[in-house]
Amino acid sequence: EVFVDSDTKVALLSGAPFDDSSWDLLSNDQIAAGRTAINRISGSRRLLAHSVFTPKKDGWMEEVDRCIAKVKPDSWKGYTVGDPLSPSKLGTYWRLDDEKLIYPFYEKAVKAGINTICIHKGLLPADYEKSWPGVWEYATVNDLGKAAKDWPKLNFVIYHSALRPFQESPDAVLAEFDKTGRIQWATDLAEIPAKFGVKNVYGEIGTAFATCAVTNPRFAAAFIGTLVRGLGPERVLWGSDSVWYGSPQWQIEAMRRLEVPEEMRKQHKFPALGAADGKIKTAIFSGNAAKLYNVNTKTALGAITTDRIAAIRAEYVAAGGERSNARYGFVARHSA
């Protein structure tokens, strides 16, 4: 799905925590084992790995120490909402700027040289104030500015760029953007560098882009334009959240074709995104993440184009295989 059915060359394997640990997707050891297996098969550095950190859970800091010593993740992954599926009954939500709880972790991350902190934000239902009472605030970015300013040696990568809407049509959010020029929580993220004078805040697009790339490309243009204008083109990162949605190729194709309409550029002072292989899209697709993860793109590309996975893909194509633009997910059915 990732390396054969799409144009993806390097990927990052992640996980997620839940109040009920039996729901956990992959343990930190399993993520690391996946990285080892793929890179052994390929003979190159194809797969990077997160370690998930879980503040407020028993033994969480000991797990951080263990990961630093043995797992050696490429970056960290955290969920300020605690459990991303439903309001945490265990109270595992937390803030990025909690000096007592989180700052000791930041100190360890800086000392270990694992200084990229990826944080899940946004993606709540339309009735979030009612369905996530007392918890929804932790999905916003109102805790990010101070943390980023206090820890300039850390890179804060906000997953989904804190876009609020989840599993709903982007039409209503686009209407709000057309009226106010703002996109719920994503605009807040884009304004942080100017408000706090920081350059270590990044927006990853993930599921946020997946939910609108095909269903409402105008909103996708407004979303990406907002991020590029506020964060700068050098701090917007590609992400697909695949294989949740199958091969990421359909999202790759959508981004290649995406452009901000001229009237939107003029009204909101958005830059043009340009060609698929132009400066801005190349930075989003690969260059920005490569810098964060210390990947020399020229060296890496040389190794990847001649590795075992490249050979497997060549065999696949020779046998008639093609890139997949299929999107996995639910289909809404409406009664007549």
Q: PLM ranges: what are they?
A:
Residues 1-5, 10, 62, 74, ...:
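Mid-to-C-terminal alpha-helical segments outside catalytic/metal-binding sites
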Residues 24-28, 61, 217, 221, ...:
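Conserved strand-to-helix beginnings and helix N-cap segments that scaffold or border functional pockets
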Residues 48-52, 157, 239:
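Short catalytic-loop micro-motif centered on adjacent basic/acidic residues
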Residues 67, 76, 109, 160, ...:
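Conserved, mostly hydrophobic/aromatic
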Residues 90-238, 246, 263-280, 315, ...:
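Catalytic pocket-lining loop regions of alpha/beta-barrel enzymes
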